Amino acid sequence: MKQTVARTLTGIPGLDEITGGGFPQGRVLLVLGEPGAGKTILCSQFLADGMTKFAENGLFVSLEESRKHWIREMVQFGWDFTSAEKQGKFAFVDASPIRTIPGEVKVGKLTIGKQDFSLMSLLEVIRSKAKAIDARRIVVDPVSLFIFQYLDESQSRKAVLDLVEALSETGATCLLSSELRRVGITGRTLQTEEYLVHGVILMQTVPNGSTMGRIIQVGKMRETDIDHQPRPYKITKNGIEVYPRESLAWNLIDMRT
């Protein structure tokens, strides 16, 4: 008899329908998309809905935006992370200095020499914050900035694997965001991080008749009966909305290696 896999409902309209009833609980998944596709919005909405709809505390780890800028952007969608933080339901780790400070890195109260900074150092901060608030949902946005610092592909792969394994050990359902890297105009290659995560969500902008449309697609999701078809989505004043029963008349982008 096939064992039923526990699911984490996202709360995002339409997304649970194309992911077989939510994300596999306690797994690490990748949200892959172009700049402006709404990766950060989707990941933040996953945390916001987790707190308000399912009483699941959340942790956001930013490798790009400062806390101030991120909070200001999320308020536009009606997500009050500041109040949640005061109530102990949410925590923010600002790791954005890793790309701007040449001599040292400061993550929270921890200062690390740039030469000695490693993924494991950051993970110690993540573990500490996640434990402190009993985080059931964790977002790392965007992991691509960390990957880009490794010139050697084997080092990059090991770094991603270390990250995925450490996040899995927290027991939380985790989302990593990463930039979709194109090859030419119409194609792309599978990226290192895709092979190492439990599932992949693709967010793209594609030709839709005489205009452009947004599509979201489940690239893979282990232990899940998923909808592989690209589905349209919109970024509204309330966040991401997926339309699981609709399709676009678009020119398919080659997703093969």
Predicted regions and their residues:
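Phosphate-binding/switch region of NTP-binding enzymes
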Residues: A172-N238
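Short hydrophobic/aromatic beta-strand immediately N-terminal to the Walker A/P-loop
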Residues: L29-L32
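Conserved P-loop
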Residues: E34-L110, S121
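Loop/turn-to-beta-strand initiation segments
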Residues: N57, G88-K89, D134-R137, E169-S177
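Phosphate-binding/switch loop-helix module in NTP-utilizing enzymes
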Residues: R99-D162, A166-S168
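C-terminal regions of RecA-like/P-loop NTPase motor modules
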Residues: M1-K2, I226-T257
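Pre-Walker A adenine-sensing motif
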Residues: T10-G22
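Conserved nucleotide-binding/hydrolysis micro-motifs of P-loop NTPases
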Residues: E64-K68, Q76, S96-T100, S144-L145, ...
